[in-house]
Amino acid sequence: MPSFDVVSEANMIEVKNAIEQSNKEISTRFDFKGSDARVEQKDRELTLFADDDFKLGQVKDVLIGKMAKRNVDVRFLDYGKVEKIGGDKVKQVVTVKKGVTGDLAKKIVRLVKDSKIKVQASIQGDAVRVSGAKRDDLQSVIAMLRKDVTDTPLDFNNFRD
């Protein structure tokens, strides 16, 4: 019975490369001359540092641009609130989302069941497994999910015949 998994996971190697490129650009840009602006990564948590709110926005724009160039969807980023860290300096914690959340998984299962396509969807941890009798049915489910779920980037892997 053919099946596939619906997952939502960023390529952390590409995220790391985008951070390194961002830090390199920030260190060479004239408008950041003499500032302490940088991006640090610890596992799935990024911390943006800057001298003020405006420069923090600039750091964020550089990071988003570099992520887009490396084909990392920026919808994976979950921005925390801006914190003051002494003087005028500010920081912002950004979390890289992983996995299909419970609400999104339920929404995907409901969409699949409401579509009247002859497939079954089941939640398995942080992924949703979709299985059906025909490969064409699974491909139509993939097309339907790409069209209907736009708030979170979805990947389809583990396609088995």
UniProtKB/Swiss-Prot annotation:
**Looking at the Swiss-Prot or TrEMBL record, what is one Pfam family this protein matches?**
DUF520
Q: Which InterPro entries match?
A: DUF520, UPF0234_N, YajQ-like_sf
Gene Ontology molecular function, alphabetical = nucleotide binding
GO CC term (a single one): cytosol
Q: What are the protein's UniProt keywords?
A: Nucleotide-binding
Asked if the Swiss-Prot or TrEMBL record annotates the protein with the keyword Nucleotide-binding, the reply is yes
Write down the NCBIfam families for this protein, in alphabetical order: PRK05412.1 (NF003819)
What does this protein do, in the record's words?
Nucleotide-binding protein.
As for family, the record states:
Belongs to the YajQ family.
* Descriptive protein name: Nucleotide-binding protein Bmul_0741/BMULJ_02519
Q: Which organism is it from?
A: Burkholderia multivorans (strain ATCC 17616 / 249)
